[in-house]
Swiss-Prot record:
Assembly description: Part of a SCF (SKP1-cullin-F-box) protein ligase complex. Binds directly to several GSK3 family proteins such as SKP1A/ASK1, ASK1/SK11, ASK3/SK12, ASK5/SK13, ASK7/BIN2/SK21, ASK9/SK22 and ASK6/SK23. Interacts with ASK7/BIN2/SK21 in a brassinosteroid (BR)-dependent manner.
Tissues expressed in: Expressed in seedlings, leaves, stems, flower buds and flowers.
Name this polypeptide is given: F-box/kelch-repeat protein KIB1
GO cellular component: cytoplasm; nucleolus; SCF ubiquitin ligase complex
Compartments reported by the entry: Cytoplasm; Nucleus, Nucleolus
Kelch repeats: 73-117, 159-209, 259-306
Disruption phenotype: Abolished brassinosteroid (BR)-induced ASK7/BIN2/SK21 degradation, and severe BR-insensitivity. Suppression of the constitutive BR-response phenotype in the dominant mutant bzr1-1D, and accumulation of phosphorylated BZR1.
Primary role: Component of SCF(ASK-cullin-F-box) E3 ubiquitin ligase complexes, which may mediate the ubiquitination and subsequent proteasomal degradation of target proteins. Required for brassinosteroid (BR) signal transduction. Mediates ASK7/BIN2/SK21 inactivation both by competing with substrate binding (e.g. BZR1) and by promoting its ubiquitination and subsequent proteasomal degradation.
InterPro entries, per the entry: F-box_BR-signaling, F-box_dom, Gal_Oxase/kelch_b-propeller, KIB1-4_b-propeller
Statement: the UniProt record of this protein carries the keyword Membrane: no
One Pfam short name: F-box
GO biological process, one term: protein ubiquitination
Length: 382
């Protein structure tokens, strides 16, 4: 009888201790939430990784979502002698810049091929691929290309698709009309060559399990990726008469656009113009359109996004424009600038100011600005 009573008293004591610990945990979450609500977007997502309590508290903060305006990333220039493992991020919504330091590898000798959310597809020393998340600093090595085709390789285009909820990813690249792809879990690159009679590929974009391929012949071929099966060609759009300086884009509704970029021949102005073409379903011809239906076009990603303020605009960089059109816009000092092209303002290109040069606090010079949409829905893909 005494033993049972003592056992009951011990249980009551343990219950009291548990209740006190629960109150302290709730109090800690409330205090952390107050701190998180005062932080900027980047600091908020840094702080949520401090501990499990901070992560739990972050889920209760209302109004913090992934950005709907594209951010910009700039990589260090090739002539930099120090800090080659750092890059700069720019948030246009808050007009703030952030330098991500000590990533652990040389970004100067690496080449960024594509991005998906906060993940970047990097190619190092021409044959070594890896995925990099700048915020979590997770780096995922991919199979080397040396076993595929040797060291003399020049990647034409590449796309990256990442599903952070399912922890899945897909990488596709091309060399002329040869395609290579790698899915999570594969131990090597798989190769296919579906365009035997066509020349090199100009541009690619991946959306909703479909790879849209624009060839120099003006054809747009669509390939469907499903599970472990090989990609299957599911559509071919009529050939476009356009031959130079263009890119394929997929809109929010799934429509395919072809973008043609041109530079005014006057060296003092160096203004550019964009023509946007969409397939007319009745005539099966590519027709010019004058509006993006209130959406914004991200040339780097090959997609359109919903726009609340900067509607009917094209986001692009001078480095990117040179890659696609073999022409630069303004003078050399502005070659790393990022621009916004407005359809409704007499085809005027407006410069988005960036600190591409070094500052008092940083001696790093940056170049090659790219647009991306940061996401913080998951910690890693491994």
């Amino acid at each position: 009888m005494t033993h049972k009573k003592q056992k009951k008293e011990m249980s009551d004591s343990e219950k009291k201790t548990f209740n006190e610990d629960s109150k302290h945990s709730i109090l800690a979450v409330d205090l952390v939430r107050l701190i998180l609500e005062r932080l900027s977007f980047v600091d908020f997502h840094r702080a949520r990784c401090v501990s499990s309590i901070w992560y739990i508290a972050s889920k209760t903060v209302i109004g913090v979502t992934n950005p709907t305006t594209p951010w910009l990333i700039l990589f260090p220039k090739g002539d930099v002698e120090i800090k080659k493992d750092s890059c700069k991020l720019y948030d246009p919504h808050e007009n703030k810049t952030y330098i991500v330091r000590d990533l652990g590898f040389d970004l100067v000798t690496s080449r960024c091929l594509a991005s998906s959310g906060s993940w970047f597809l990097m190619l190092d020393h021409r044959t070594e691929f890896h995925l990099l998340n700048l915020f979590t600093r997770v780096r995922i090595p991919l199979p080397s290309l040396e076993s595929t085709r040797g060291s003399d390789i020049k990647i034409g285009n590449a796309v990256l698709w990442v599903d952070e909820q399912r922890k899945d990813y897909l990488v596709v690249w091309n060399i002329s009309s040869l395609f290579g792809y790698h899915k999570k879990g594969d131990d090597r690159w798989k190769v296919f060559k579906p365009l035997e009679n066509e020349r090199c590929i100009i541009a690619m974009v991946f959306k909703e399990n479909k790879l849209y391929v624009l060839s120099v012949d003006g054809n747009v071929d669509v390939f469907y990726f499903s599970g472990n099966d090989s990609p299957v060609r599911c559509a071919t759009l009529p050939s476009s008469p356009l031959r130079k300086g263009h890119k394929v884009v997929v809109t929010l509704s799934g429509e395919v656009l072809i973008i043609v970029a041109k530079v005014e021949p006057y060296p003092r102005t160096r203004l550019c113009f964009f023509a946007v073409y969409k397939m007319d379903p009745k005539s099966s011809r590519w027709e010019t359109i004058k509006s993006l239906a209130g959406e914004a076009l991200i040339l780097d990603l090959g997609i359109t996004v919903e726009a609340k303020v900067m509607k009917n605009c094209i986001y692009f960089s001078n480095d990117q424009f040179h890659r696609y059109n073999e022409n630069s816009l303004w003078n050399v000092s502005n070659k790393s600038g990022v621009f916004v092209y407005h359809f409704r303002s007499a085809n005027v290109v407006q410069l988005v100011e960036l600190l591409t040069a070094s500052s008092r606090t940083s001696k790093i010079l940056f170049k090659d600005a790219r647009c991306f949409f940061p996401t913080f829905t998951s910690k890693w893909l491994l």
